[in-house]
């Protein structure tokens, strides 16, 4: 009985901890768990030459605001098939 109770407590702690972690893509298109305080995923455009952009992907607390930028707050929402 004690083992069952301990198992339930451990499972509850693990589930609660995982529920608070946002997962985003980083610039290398790897999945990363965002640190505390970074509650959004973003894809933002960095101009590299006239009319061409490099897209950066990251966890953030405040998103960039541009015509090609994406800001979202669900797991893996900042993936894009668009290339600059």
Curated annotation (Swiss-Prot):
It is found in: Secreted. Disulfide bonds join 24-41, 34-59, 63-71, 72-77. The keyword Glycosyltransferase does not apply. Gene3D superfamilies: CD59. InterPro entries: Snake_toxin-like_sf. The keyword Signal applies. Expressed by the venom gland. It comes from the Eukaryota. GO terms for molecular function: toxin activity. One of its GO terms (cellular component) is extracellular region. Belongs to the three-finger toxin family. Short-chain subfamily. This is Three-finger toxin 3FTx-1. It comes from Micrurus corallinus (Brazilian coral snake).
């Amino acid at each position: 009985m004690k083992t069952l109770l301990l198992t339930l407590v451990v499972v509850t702690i693990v589930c609660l901890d995982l529920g608070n972690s946002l997962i985003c893509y980083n610039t290398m298109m790897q999945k990363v768990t965002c640190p505390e305080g970074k509650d959004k995923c973003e894809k933002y455009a960095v101009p590299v030459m006239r009319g061409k952009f490099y897209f950066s992907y990251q966890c953030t607390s405040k998103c960039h605001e541009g015509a090609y930028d994406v800001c979202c707050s669900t797991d893996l929402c900042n993936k894009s098939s668009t290339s600059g």
